[in-house]
């Protein structure tokens, strides 16, 4: 039986797809992946919603466009959005006690470990010493 690799996408992967000059390797990774192998965290949705709210202050029309895109992500990933469960929170607590780390990135990494996913991110420096399978598509298209 073949085990299918599954991926947890960091918020920076999602945001990259909105850029006018998005990194080709990121787009290639996403287009070459089976959609059902890609997962999101509720934390990424929260970060994106925060961005929408902040953008509303300076550019309401752009904010509405981004909000529509975020709503589309939520719909498209509906059965592949992971919450922060007890095991992920406990692992995050252990890792955070080792040294200061960004909360959301470390929670995402813990979620990836608990659910046996490869964490796809550009922010590898804060988690490189952790037992997390990581893929940085800015550097390489596949693990």
Residue ranges and their predicted role:
Residues 1-3, 109, 114-143:
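Acidic, PIN/NYN-like endoribonuclease modules and their adjacent C-terminal/linker elements
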Residues 2-3, 50-56, 64, 75-120:
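Active-site neighborhoods of divalent-metal-dependent phosphate/nucleic-acid chemistry enzymes
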Residues 13, 44, 88, 107-108, ...:
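Alpha-helix capping/helix-boundary segments
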Residues 16-17, 51, 91-95, 130, ...:
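Residues that scaffold the ATP/ADP-binding catalytic core of kinase and kinase-like folds
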Residues 46, 88-90, 140-143:
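A short acidic, often aromatic-flanked loop/helix-cap motif at beta-alpha or helix-coil junctions
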């Amino acid at each position: 039986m073949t085990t299918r690799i599954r991926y947890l996408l960091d918020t920076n992967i999602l945001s990259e797809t909105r850029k006018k000059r998005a990194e080709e390797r990121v787009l290639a990774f996403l287009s070459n992946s089976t959609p059902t192998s890609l997962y999101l965290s509720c934390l990424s949705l929260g970060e994106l919603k925060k961005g929408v709210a902040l953008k509303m202050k300076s550019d309401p029309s752009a904010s509405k466009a981004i909000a529509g895109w975020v709503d589309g992500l939520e719909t498209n990933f509906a059965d592949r959005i992971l919450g922060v469960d007890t095991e992920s929170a406990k692992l995050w607590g252990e890792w955070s006690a080792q040294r200061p780390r960004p909360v959301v990135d470390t929670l995402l990494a813990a979620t990836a470990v608990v659910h046996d996913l490869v964490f796809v991110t550009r922010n590898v420096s804060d988690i490189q010493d952790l037992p997390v399978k990581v893929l940085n598509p800015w550097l390489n298209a596949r693990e």
